[in-house]
UniProtKB/Swiss-Prot annotation:
<dbReference type="GO" id="GO:0045275">
    <property type="term" value="C:respiratory chain complex III"/>
</dbReference>
<feature type="topological domain" description="Mitochondrial matrix">
    <location>
        <begin position="1"/>
        <end position="27"/>
    </location>
</feature>
<keyword id="KW-1133">Transmembrane helix</keyword>
<keyword id="KW-0999">Mitochondrion inner membrane</keyword>
<dbReference type="GO" id="GO:0005743">
    <property type="term" value="C:mitochondrial inner membrane"/>
</dbReference>
<dbReference type="GO" id="GO:0008121">
    <property type="term" value="F:ubiquinol-cytochrome-c reductase activity"/>
</dbReference>
<feature type="binding site">
    <location>
        <position position="16"/>
    </location>
    <ligand>
        <name>a ubiquinone</name>
    </ligand>
</feature>
<dbReference type="InterPro" id="IPR048260">
    <property type="entry name" value="Cytochrome_b_C_euk/bac"/>
</dbReference>
<feature type="topological domain" description="Mitochondrial intermembrane">
    <location>
        <begin position="341"/>
        <end position="347"/>
    </location>
</feature>
<keyword id="KW-0679">Respiratory chain</keyword>
<keyword id="KW-0812">Transmembrane</keyword>
<feature type="binding site" description="axial binding residue">
    <location>
        <position position="197"/>
    </location>
    <ligand>
        <name>heme b b566</name>
    </ligand>
</feature>
<feature type="topological domain" description="Mitochondrial matrix">
    <location>
        <begin position="205"/>
        <end position="223"/>
    </location>
</feature>
<feature type="topological domain" description="Mitochondrial intermembrane">
    <location>
        <begin position="136"/>
        <end position="172"/>
    </location>
</feature>
<keyword id="KW-0496">Mitochondrion</keyword>
<dbReference type="GO" id="GO:0009060">
    <property type="term" value="P:aerobic respiration"/>
</dbReference>
<feature type="topological domain" description="Mitochondrial matrix">
    <location>
        <begin position="309"/>
        <end position="319"/>
    </location>
</feature>
Amino acid sequence: MAFRKSNVYLSLVNSYIIDSPQPSSINYWWNMGSLLGLCLVIQIVTGIFMAMHYSSNIELAFSSVEHIMRDVHNGYILRYLHANGASFFFMVMFMHMAKGLYYGSYRSPRVTLWNVGVIIFILTIATAFLGYCCVYGQMSHWGATVITNLFSAIPFVGNDIVSWLWGGFSVSNPTIQRFFALHYLVPFIIAAMVIMHLMALHIHGSSNPLGITGNLDRIPMHSYFIFKDLVTVFLFMLILALFVFYSPNTLGHPDNYIPGNPLVTPASIVPEWYLLPFYAILRSIPDKLLGVITMFAAILVLLVLPFTDRSVVRGNTFKVLSKFFFFIFVFNFVLLGQIGACHVEVPYVLMGQIATFIYFAYFLIIVPVISTIENVLFYIGRVNK
């Protein structure tokens, strides 16, 4: 027996990335998982090295980031890799989730796999927000103020929760210090959840574009899919390097190069681009409490998909109606992101409300109705044969 199979530790590696049987029909959309693993490693490694030079004291936080940029050897590469790496992390994560939605990866028997993925998504959003606050520029300070103030919408105990989060009466030194501590901790929790994600994947294996069982035609992970993954890894590294070295601030906000000042409110307070769709959903509801509930529901609604999709066929590969409404949903999500970056004024308020309705309607109305209609059409087509 090969040593990689007999050794208790290497046998785990072997069963996941060497001899793991994969459906022969999977396409490049299945490469997003390996890219997400690469992104997580980049973020953790660059974050650890940056933490060696960063100070979480509110008087020193902004200056310590500039110290990393100016004085630390290759510090600017660390900072720009970390900042742009976060944006690319979310780009790939959105594509990974879109693949799951399109190909029905949330369907039984992979419901646990999907649910763990949603938890990873929530933890990643929290980590990104905490890290954005650690820079303590203008947008960091006011972003922290706005988002933490959302908890004040909770009846009776909301204001106490906000004061507890702040560690005082406003965003101050205790806030940034505890945010940094959590920002350092949560990525390791994400790494643990990724291991759980892989364990859940290993039970039933990967799905495939055809939506049928792949047990009849599987090939080993190595060397076929390892080299296939390397194609997108090198392409990803090339595009990331172009941003890091030639356009490092394109995905950021210029106001965050101004030290945080609680006495000066920016013209517009917007989060990073990857949180804009959920920010638009929050702002589309006039009532504060309902807005907060709706924003969190926009993420948690992903958990109901395994139950609202009633189709007898997994995925949208052979379903024309489902394809059409899926791309409507994608367009609507991009539109929400654009609206989230706009001021709260006519016509963006009404557009945001319509887009929010379409977002929830897709999961709760469109998917169950269309899947039922397609089931009837499949049945009619089979009977007529």
